[in-house]
Regions:
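A catalytic-pocket lid/entrance helix-loop region that shapes and gates access to the active site
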Residues: 71-105
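Active-site loop/oxyanion-hole signature of alpha/beta-hydrolase fold enzymes
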Residues: 3-48
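Conserved hydrolase catalytic core segment
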Residues: 38-83
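Short, solvent-exposed loop/turn segments at secondary-structure junctions
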Residues: 9-10, 21, 52-53, 76-78, ...
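Generic structural signal for small/hydrophobic residues in well-ordered secondary structure
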Residues: 2, 6-9, 31, 46-50, ...
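Helix-loop "lid/cap" segments that line or gate small-molecule binding pockets
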Residues: 103-115, 122-128, 141-148
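Conserved serine/cysteine hydrolase catalytic core
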Residues: 114, 132-177
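Alpha-helical elements of Rossmann-like donor-binding domains used by nucleotide-donor carbohydrate transfer enzymes
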Residues: 26-34, 58, 105, 122, ...
Length: 177
């Protein structure tokens, strides 16, 4: 059995329309509710990718006994103590100013492959107009990039737990995805 949840604000389900409804803590709470309360998963293999790593790695840290293995692709768990790449900081700033927020075009610019019109339409489908893009638009700003970030202490605590995690953990990064 594989569970591949869309993060709140990204999939086709109902979603809050105000950016203030989206916080790192709320995203983590929504995901933990799905995994542990609704699906009642007890022991599972975890694959996290991109934004999902910000949340999934916290789940590993907080519930290590539930995790059998971890695969983490193109992600991390920043604390705001290390300098983020200038390109990410520029994207973080730009994402908050973009209006409209062209989800499909953003995905296309972030890939090395040409995406077909059908694939771009699939990326755009959950966001028929700007009111549906609050979650996608705010997510870059939720990434801790400064020591003052509200999630800095929580991510540092998660790192302390992750350093003790002794189960299989595979990290994947690509320069061509």
């Amino acid at each position: 059995r594989v569970i591949a949840p869309d993060l709140m604000g990204f999939g086709r389900s109902d979603k809050p329309t105000e950016q203030s409804d989206y916080t790192y803590a709320k995203h983590l709470a929504w995901l933990k509710e799905l995994v542990f309360e609704r699906l009642k998963l007890e022991k599972f293999h975890l694959f996290v990718q991109d934004w999902g790593g910000l949340l999934g790695l916290r789940i590993v840290a907080e519930h290590p006994d539930s995790i059998l293995t971890v695969t983490a692709g193109n992600t991390g768990l920043p604390t705001g103590d290390q300098q983020m790449p200038d390109a990410f900081l520029a994207w973080q700033k730009m994402s908050q100013k973009m209006n409209p927020f062209p989800v499909g075009s953003i995905i296309q610019r972030a890939t090395v492959s040409h995406l077909s019109p059908e694939i771009l339409a699939a990326y755009n489908a959950p966001h028929p107009d700007e009111t549906y893009k609050a979650g996608a638009k705010i997510f870059p700003a939720l990434v801790p990039t400064t020591p003052e970030d509200p999630e800095n202490a929580n991510n540092k605590a998660a790192w302390a737990s992750l350093m003790k995690f002794e189960k299989p953990f595979l990290t994947l990064f690509s320069d061509s995805d």
